[in-house]
């Protein structure tokens, strides 16, 4: 069998434009790509595979975000001999068809190939765009050593809490002939059998709290692979105040977003002092204090500066969304939309 590659670097689900086209997030995306290129060059890797969801918003591309995209694509084009880019569901204007995507100009870069129109098979590999209609049935016929795609497989986790239900359609067993299957779409790193979800580039929100196993994947033709985590990635943490005061260094690091649950009584002045001190000492991106119970507020105006919320709002909302039973509404889609509301 001919070899499509000797070794390659893989990344997925970067989501340019997330958090209302946040400049901070887009800078994170660009800096991640610069870091990835450095790591690939250290190993003399010339091929790069992207497994879907370059942009976050399907209907519109913000002008600022577009400029970040152009810079990032130029970096990929200039630093790799070949870049295969799969279109994920977030890259498509319509979820159920692929005739319009948000990267129509990417093929203008000579070293970048967009995988959107159909399954691309060559020399022992298959690149599969977001599947529509009954295209999933074709995957049983693939005889490639490696399959790369953006698959929504049942019994894998969307995040630490939510497992993808079985809606019929594609299953992991449909790709059992492949030695390895690498997929974007689910942001949590996980594997089962020959299926590997390497995880997205870096944590995006509090559903990723304490889960930093994301970044890039190095794959060799012999099937061996290893992961590398971006050291400057943003992190998300949720912890009790008592834990924070006891061992802040194990919880807080540079670029951390954190929610601190007030499991001990403190005054409003003490709360402000804690926030200001830890934010400065650890170069935090965000710190918010959350009463563990509503009655812990004790009449004090905890919401004066907008940084403190009632207990477990996220878990309450997520549990309600997860409990919805409907033939026409996907719980995981609602959960994803809710998670993306956090800025």
Where are the model-predicted features located?
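Core catalytic region of metal-dependent phosphoesterases/phosphodiesterases
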Residues: 2-7, 14, 18-119, 174-178
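Beta-strand-turn-beta hairpins that frame and shape the catalytic cleft
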Residues: 2-9, 119-127, 142-146, 194-195, ...
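Divalent metal-coordination and catalytic microenvironments
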Residues: 13, 33, 48, 53, ...
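Active-site environment of divalent metal-dependent phosphoester hydrolases
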Residues: 15-19, 56-59, 86-97, 132-135, ...
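Accessory, non-catalytic peripheral segments of nucleic-acid enzymes
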Residues: 42, 220-343
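Conserved catalytic scaffold of divalent metal-dependent phosphoesterases
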Residues: 69, 87, 91-173, 201, ...
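Short, conserved loop/helix-junction motifs that constitute active-site signature segments
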Residues: 76-79, 140-143, 172-177, 251-254
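Conserved beta-sheet core of the metallophosphoesterase superfamily
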Residues: 160-225
């Amino acid at each position: 069998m001919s070899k499509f590659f000797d070794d390659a670097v893989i990344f997925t689900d970067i989501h340019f434009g997330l958090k209302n086209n946040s400049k901070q997030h887009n800078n994170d995306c660009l800096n991640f790509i610069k870091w990835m290129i450095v790591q690939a060059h250290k190993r003399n890797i010339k091929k790069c595979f992207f497994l879907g969801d370059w942009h976050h918003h399907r209907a519109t591309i913000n002008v600022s975000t577009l400029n970040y995209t152009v810079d990032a694509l130029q970096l990929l084009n200039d630093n790799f001999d070949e870049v295969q880019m799969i279109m994920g569901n977030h890259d498509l204007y319509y979820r159920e068809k692929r005739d319009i995507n948000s990267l129509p100009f990417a093929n203008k870069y000579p070293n970048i190939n967009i995988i959107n129109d159909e399954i691309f098979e060559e020399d022992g590999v298959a690149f599969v765009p977001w599947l529509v209609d009954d295209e999933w049935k074709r995957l049983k016929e693939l005889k490639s050593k490696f399959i790369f795609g953006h698959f929504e497989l049942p019994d894998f986790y969307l995040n630490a809490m939510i497992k993808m239900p079985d809606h019929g359609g594609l299953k992991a067993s449909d790709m059992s002939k492949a030695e390895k299957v690498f997929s974007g779409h689910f942001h949590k790193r996980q594997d089962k059998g020959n299926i590997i979800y390497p995880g997205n580039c870096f944590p995006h929100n509090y559903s990723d709290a304490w889960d930093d196993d994301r970044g890039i994947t190095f794959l060799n033709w012999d099937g061996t692979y290893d992961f590398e985590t971006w050291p400057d990635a943003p992190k998300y943490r949720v912890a009790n105040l008592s834990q924070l005061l006891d061992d802040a260094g194990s919880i807080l690091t540079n670029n951390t977003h954190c929610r601190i649950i007030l499991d001990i009584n403190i005054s409003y002045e003490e709360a402000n002092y804690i926030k200001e001190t830890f934010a400065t000492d650890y170069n935090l991106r965000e710190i918010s204090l959350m009463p563990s119970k509503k009655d812990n507020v004790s009449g004090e105006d905890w919401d004066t500066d907008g940084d403190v919320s009632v207990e477990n709002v996220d878990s309450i909302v997520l549990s309600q969304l997860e409990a919805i039973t409907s033939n026409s509404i996907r719980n995981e889609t609602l959960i994803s939309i809710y998670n993306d509301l956090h800025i």
